[in-house]
Structures are given as C-alpha cells and as structure tokens.
C-alpha cells in the first residue's frame, strides 16, 4: 500500500502543469548589480557549444530613428528577415505615435539587436549590465540595449499574446537609464500590490487565472503597467481603463513618469 502511494505521488509530480513563464525579461545580473530575473534560463556557452556571434557578424541598419544591429544569419534568411523588420517597424511606429516626442527621442538612443536564433537567449530582453554579459559570454556591446534573441519566437509571441513587446523592453531601458530601478514611487506602488495581493490571481490572455508577471520585481511591474497603459498587455489589467480601476496608484505613476501630466 505504501509503495502504491509513493508511485502515485511521483506520477502526480511528473505530470504537474508547468509554471507559466513570460518570454521577455531583464536578464539576471551578478550580485550587486541592479537587474534581476524571475528564472535564469540562459547560460554561457559550455564545452562543445558554439559561442555567441562576434561583433563582426552584425550589420547596422536603422528604423524610425532606432539603430538596429542585425545578425548576418538572419539577413541570409530573406523572408524571415523581412517579416521581422516589418514587425519591428510596426511596433516602433506605434511607439512614436503614443509616447510624447521627448520620450521617443530618449528611447531612440537604445539600440536593438536582432538574432536569427540565439540558443542562450529568449525571444526579447533588455540588458542593463555589461558585467553580466561578459560573465555569460555575450557581447558587452549589448549592454543598455534591447536584444531580440529569436526571430521566429519574436514573431510568434507578437502575433499571439504580446503585440507591444518592444514597448515593454524599451520601458525597461527607460526605467534603468532615466528613472533608476529603485525609483521611490514605483518601489512604493510595487510593495503595496505585493501586500494587497490583488495581482496574485489575474486573468491571462488564454483565459486562465495566473499569478501576474508584474510580481516578479519592480522592473517587470513597471514594464507590464506601461504595456497596459499605452497598448495591450497579456495579463489583466490588459488596457489603460483596467489599470486605472485595478491599480490607480500605478496608473498615476505611469502617467507622470512618461510625461503625460504636463
């Protein structure tokens, strides 16, 4: 009887539903750095694995005032390259229309790197830390940049659940470079929602109730709130009106820090 119980318990663990993961994030930084990540999913190249592409493998391009650095492997796949550039243009164009001109100019200083398929990256992330990049075998030139690590995954996610993913990543850059990750107002609001518990179980875009990705840390909280305020997020609150009713304090902070109270 005891053996049957143990086997049943093991089977229940084996077939447990995986924890929902968000594909885009700020990468984990070494101790003492300001960036964090919910679940480290990337490692530096190990024995027998290809290293990250060298700087010479990237060609410079431009899109609506943003510098693009495109991996030559992606350029070689002409159709995929075109699709990715079209989607990047589409998202950046929306950003130029919905944000104040001053903020757009600040975001245009953030380069965007495009990969065909980097096995050590998820689809899209912002890199705040040169030391983390160096320690994990990445190009340190990617520091303070947005990195699209997988072209196909980027296209898939933007079509199915995250139409404003570049806004999310550029919000990380703005938070890091212009507000500071320890911005007092954002930290206060983040601590308040953790205590209130009203982000612990929210509607996800697939109809499931899940823990909101914003609870990861104050960085994701700000980026997720920015997505909801200016576009559409994949976690409730999905849009601006819902953010205003669900989290009025953060609604006002987003308005203020993006310059909409002037």
Each model region followed by its residue ranges:
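Acidic/His-rich structured neighborhood in mature extracellular/periplasmic domains
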Residues: 71, 81-195, 238, 251
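Metalloprotease/metallohydrolase-associated module, dominated by Zn2+-dependent proteases
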Residues: 134-143, 149-152, 156, 190-262
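Alpha-helical hydrophobic/aromatic positions enriched in membrane-embedded helices and signal peptides
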Residues: 57, 160-164, 212
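N-terminal low-structure segments adjacent to metalloprotease catalytic domains
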Residues: 5, 20-115, 119, 128, ...
